[in-house]
Amino acid sequence: AEHMVMSKSTSPHVLTAMEVDYERVEQVRKMHKGAWKAEEGFSLTYLPFIARAVADALRDFPHLNASFGGDHLVVHDEVNMAIAVDIDFEGLLAPVVKNVDGKRLRQIARDITYVAGRTRTKQLTPDDLSGGTFTLTNAGQYGTMMQFPIINQPQVAILSTDGVKRKPVVVTDEFGNESIAIHSVGVLALAWDHRAFDGAYAAAFLNRIQEILETRDWEAEIR
């Protein structure tokens, strides 16, 4: 609790949110979920797709993969992603998946499942909790519409992955014709420190994540 209060008093928190059409991700999840569960022993959720997209976007927007050292912004070379894990509604810990930017989807999913399991069984070491450069918090598992998370100090941003629902959307074909379709849609909400960068930078970062999630060939990625 003291850490959260300190974070709010230290960083001028700003929230930027963007809606994402996850239909491309959902089609791949639906096609592979049975085989994935049999091979890996855990379910294929949206979170590793988001983590993969975030890691790639951080290469283009490095000031989000940063922390404050005193009054100086320190930009990190590696993406070490802290994953907020609930502990029976008694608090959160954020174990770190190291070098996410050097991993593909399947390995990221394995690593997230591993650190979450160690958290819930109280097997974390101090090393598991150190070195994070950016944080994901997955409130969407509870069906949230949009959450305003608190930055994990001394980092400068945290992304809330909120609930995904089936909704009508306007789709445009190759000839420019519009129609209505039912897609899986959700919100990504970014809380960020206004000392580190401005609103345009934060919005462009979210837009890059959105672009990756909506256009990447996830079928090739999952193999």
For each of these PLM feature ranges, what is it?
Residues A1-R223:
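C-terminal catalytic/motor cores of large multi-domain enzyme assemblies
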